C-alpha cells in the first residue's frame, strides 16, 4: 500500500494486486503497531537510516491525516549488572544512528516511571510510539485511490513472464486476466520467495531463503500494568517478551 500510494501520487498508473479479500489481513495486521526509533540496527546500515527517517515521516503523516497514534516512549530494561554494558552499547548505537532523545535511567527513575518494573537501569527512548495500523492502511488506501490508483482484491499473481517491454502478469481469482506492465514491485511479505520463483527466468541464486521466526501474541484483559512500551535486553535474534498498549 505504501509503495503503491507513493507511485500513484508521483503520477504513475498503478494497479495494486491483493491476494486476499481485504487489505492488510496478513503480516500488516500481525504486529505490535510500534513506531520504532532506530536503536537496534547497525550504524549506517540501510535499515537504520530508513527507520530513523521513516519514524519522522510517519509521525508527520499521522498528524496530517488524523491517523491515531501516540508517542508513549519505550524502556529497554536491564535487570542485572551484567546487562549494563549491553545497554550502554545500545545507547551508543542509537545515538550514532541519529536517535537523539535517548536517556539513561537508574533503578529509582525506572520505578518512578513504571512502578511494576524492577530493574537495575533502563534506556528510555522518547520518540518510540504506537500507531493504529488498520487506520494507517485505510489512509494509504484512500490516498492511492484518490490518485487514480486501482486496488484489485482477490487477485493473486499466479505467474509472471518477462517481456521485451517489462512483465506480463497472469492474474487469477474470480476475474482472471493478463496484465502488461513496465514496472513490477514485489511487496508480498512472506509470499516474496514464491512470487520470485513464479517469475520466468528469474535466477534462483538471487532468491533469498525464507526463514520462519515464530511469534506468540497474548491479550491481557483489564487495565494495563504499564505506561510505556517495555522491552528486555535483546538476546541474539530474540527480542524476548515485550508489551504494547492500546491507544488511549
Report the location of each language-model feature.
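Dinucleotide-binding Rossmann-like beta1-alpha1 core, especially the glycine-rich loop
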Residues: 33-109, 113, 119, 244
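Gly/Ala-rich phosphate-binding loop of Rossmann-like dinucleotide-binding domains
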Residues: 4, 8, 143
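Flavin-dependent oxidoreductases
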Residues: 160-248
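Helix-loop-beta segment of a Rossmann-like dinucleotide-binding subdomain
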Residues: 41, 68-78, 101-104, 109-147, ...
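Residues forming the Rossmann-fold NAD(P)(H) cofactor-binding site
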Residues: 1
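Glycine-rich FAD pyrophosphate-binding loop
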Residues: 8-30
Amino acid at each position: 500500500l505504501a509503495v503503491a500510494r507513493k507511485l500513484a501520487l508521483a503520477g504513475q498508473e498503478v494497479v495494486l494486486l491483493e491476494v486476499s479479500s481485504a487489505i492488510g489481513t496478513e503480516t500488516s495486521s500481525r504486529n505490535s503497531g510500534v513506531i520504532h526509533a532506530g536503536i537496534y540496527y547497525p550504524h549506517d546500515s540501510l535499515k537504520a537510516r530508513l527507520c530513523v527517517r521513516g519514524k519522522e515521516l510517519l509521525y508527520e503523516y499521522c498528524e496530517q491525516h488524523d491517523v491515531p497514534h501516540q508517542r508513549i516512549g519505550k524502556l529497554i530494561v536491564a535487570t542485572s549488572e551484567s546487562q549494563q554494558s549491553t545497554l550502554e552499547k545500545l545507547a551508543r548505537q542509537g545515538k550514532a544512528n541519529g536517535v537523539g532523545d535517548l536517556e539513561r535511567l537508574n533503578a529509582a527513575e525506572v520505578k518512578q516511571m513504571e512502578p511494576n518494573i524492577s530493574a537495575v537501569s533502563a534506556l528510555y527512548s522518547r520518540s518510540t510510539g504506537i500507531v493504529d495500523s488498520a487506520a494507517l492502511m485505510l489512509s494509504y488506501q484512500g490516498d492511492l485511490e484518490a490518485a487514480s490508483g486501482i486496488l484489485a482484491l482477490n487477485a493473486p499473481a499466479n505467474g509472471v513472464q518477462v517481456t521485451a517491454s517489462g512483465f506480463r502478469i497472469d492474474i487469477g481469482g474470480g476475474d482472471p486476466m493478463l496484465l502488461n506492465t513496465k514496472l513490477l514491485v514485489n511487496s508480498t511479505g512472506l509470499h516474496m520467495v514464491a512470487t520470485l520463483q513464479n517469475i520466468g527466468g528469474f535466477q534462483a541464486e538471487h532468491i533469498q531463503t525464507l526463514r520462519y521466526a515464530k511469534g506468540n501474541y497474548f491479550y491481557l484483559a483489564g487495565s494495563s500494568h504499564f505506561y510505556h512500551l517495555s522491552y528486555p535486553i535483546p538476546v541474539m535474534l530474540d527480542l524476548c517478551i515485550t508489551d504494547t498498549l492500546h491507544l488511549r
